[in-house]
Regions:
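Acyltransferase
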Residues: 1-150
């Protein structure tokens, strides 16, 4: 992680994933969606200036925004140059079959043992959108009322 480029930003915006996705092309690949936390809370990630420009647009339209206190623009192209090294490190770990069900933040669905014990899965997790809202929706649909979130 230390070799990932600095200078990025992550900002939570009171907007749907679709609303945010519709505005991303105007930023020419400098931004991506880091996380979909709720139906109306989406986190953007990428270049600092582009992220703040987009957040200002949403704020000027009456939406709440909050910059996240992070060291890097995770889940964005800023991570691309460390993915190979991350995979190399992840491949040295010993993985075990989970003893409790785990919902994947990549899919919002139950993760398989094959996924959770594969270094490539964790590389994807570093780079792609966190589908937290989809996971909560899946749990709710299956009448789960108690959750444990594990993260950094």
């Amino acid at each position: 992680m230390q070799t990932a480029p600095t200078g990025g930003a992550m900002i939570a915006i009171e907007a749907t994933e679709t609303e945010i996705r519709d505005t991303l092309p105007t930023h020419h690949g400098h931004l991506d969606i880091a996380a979909v936390n709720t139906p109306h809370s989406t986190v953007i990630t990428g270049d600092h200036d582009a992220a703040h420009q987009l957040a200002t647009t949403w704020r000027n339209n009456g939406r709440r925004t909050k910059q996240l206190n992070v060291s890097h623009a995770f889940h964005s192209p800023h991570m691309d140059n460390i993915l190979n090294d991350f995979h190399t490190t992840a491949a040295t770990l010993t993985y075990h079959t989970p003893t409790i069900p785990i919902i994947s933040n990549l899919t919002g669905q139950p993760a398989t043992t094959e996924q959770l014990t594969n270094p490539h899965y964790w590389v994807q997790h570093l780079r792609h959108t966190v589908r937290f809202n989809d996971g909560i929706h899946h749990l709710h649909h299956h009448n789960v009322t108690t959750y444990i979130e594990l993260g950094p």
